[in-house]
């Protein structure tokens, strides 16, 4: 059960979900036609010790094994893998556009096992600030350093809780509020209550000068019936793989029905925003998965929002 001040490392709670995401990036990297390349994702997964359920995501036959349950379960597993690749590619492109426009200050909110500070080709002078729980940041930087991996930008860790006074910690790490910034909230908002989401964007806006940019993945809305169905399906997948499901992601997510539309909120608070539905972006890059349930429900899938400070 989540609390307002809960904490975690890379093996527990919200921290462990970063391992799942990294596993999807590793699988994508191994494809003959990858949308993105993350040469460090597999390393970060296999050293995390977060449990067999997450390492099983590296299995190239996972979709076929899920098909033994039923076609819809296989489609869901394939969708989750494809979605992570498309999401990563979308935000990689966002950062490429930001630095092409001259932005040299980047802040990744709840960075988890995000390896962009290491794998992207950043212009000289770029500083990437990563905000997350202290133990999550420490695991990533230590693991990569021990394997000879160095950042491709000036990387600065900001150990802070995004539900607390993280802007002060960011400034203490060297953040310049007078410089244009490219912000990213990827894989984050669903783990925040609705009011915390609004507060986060208010805090971002307070330290963003005109010309700053932000990109965010929205939190899709699922009813209790759908959540129960998803739990049952993932338990079946775990049973087929013969492994214990140690974390219920649905218990970590806040399913607030009154959560504000990110694009609308930003538009109302001094940003010029646009959004792209995840299914539309997946189709655009040729990675939509047929057979995914609720494909026609506009609230069931995330949106990718980008905005510029006015």
From Swiss-Prot:
- The residue stretches assigned to a coiled coil in this entry are none
Q: Which domain of life is it from?
A: Bacteria
- Please give the GO cellular component terms listed in this UniProt entry: cytosol; plasma membrane
EC numbers on record: 2.1.1.-
Q: Which UniProt keywords apply?
A: Methyltransferase, S-adenosyl-L-methionine, Transferase
GO annotation terms (biological process): methylation; symbiont-mediated perturbation of host innate immune response
A Pfam family this chain is assigned to: LCM
Q: Which residues bind S-adenosyl-L-methionine?
A: 132, 161-162
Tagged with keyword Methyltransferase: yes
State the PANTHER family in the record. Answer: S-ADENOSYL-L-METHIONINE-DEPENDENT METHYLTRANSFERASE YKTD-RELATED, S-ADENOSYL-L-METHIONINE-DEPENDENT METHYLTRANSFERASES SUPERFAMILY PROTEIN
Q: What family does the entry list? A: Belongs to the UPF0677 family.
* NCBIfam families, sorted: mthyl_TIGR00027
Q: What is this protein called?
A: Putative S-adenosyl-L-methionine-dependent methyltransferase Rv0146
- What organism is the protein native to? Mycobacterium tuberculosis (strain ATCC 25618 / H37Rv)
The organism that produces this protein has a lineage beginning with: Bacteria, Bacillati, Actinomycetota, Actinomycetes, Mycobacteriales
């Amino acid at each position: 059960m989540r609390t307002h001040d809960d904490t975690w490392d890379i093996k527990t709670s919200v921290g462990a979900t970063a391992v799942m995401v990294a596993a999807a990036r590793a699988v994508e990297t191994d494809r003959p036609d990858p949308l993105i390349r993350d040469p460090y994702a597999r390393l970060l997964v296999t050293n995390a010790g977060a449990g067999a359920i997450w390492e099983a995501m590296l299995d190239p036959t996972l979709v076929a094994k899920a098909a033994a349950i039923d076609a819809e379960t296989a489609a869901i597993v394939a969708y989750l893998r494809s979605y992570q690749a498309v999401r990563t590619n979308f935000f990689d492109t966002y950062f490429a556009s930001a630095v092409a426009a001259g932005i040299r200050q980047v802040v990744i909110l709840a960075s988890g096992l995000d390896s962009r500070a290491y794998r992207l080709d950043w212009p000289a002078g770029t500083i990437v600030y990563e905000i997350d729980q202290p133990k999550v940041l420490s695991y990533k930087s230590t693991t990569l350093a021990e394997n000879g991996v160095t950042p491709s930008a000036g990387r600065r860790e900001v150990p802070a809780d995004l539900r607390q006074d993280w802007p002060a910690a960011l400034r203490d790490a060297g953040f310049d509020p007078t410089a244009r910034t490219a912000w990213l909230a990827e894989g984050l908002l669903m783990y925040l209550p609705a009011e915390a989401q609004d507060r986060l964007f208010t805090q971002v806006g307070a330290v963003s000068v005109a010309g700053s940019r932000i990109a965010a993945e929205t939190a899709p809305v699922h009813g209790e019936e759908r959540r129960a169905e998803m739990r049952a399906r993932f338990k079946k997948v775990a049973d087929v793989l013969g492994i214990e499901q140690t974390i219920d992601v649905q218990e970590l997510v806040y399913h607030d029905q009154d959560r504000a539309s990110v694009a609308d909120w930003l538009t109302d608070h001094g940003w010029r925003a646009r959004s792209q539905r995840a299914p539309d972006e997946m189709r655009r890059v040729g990675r939509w998965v047929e057979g995914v349930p609720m494909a026609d429900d506009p609230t069931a899938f995330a949106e990718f929002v980008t905005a510029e400070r006015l």
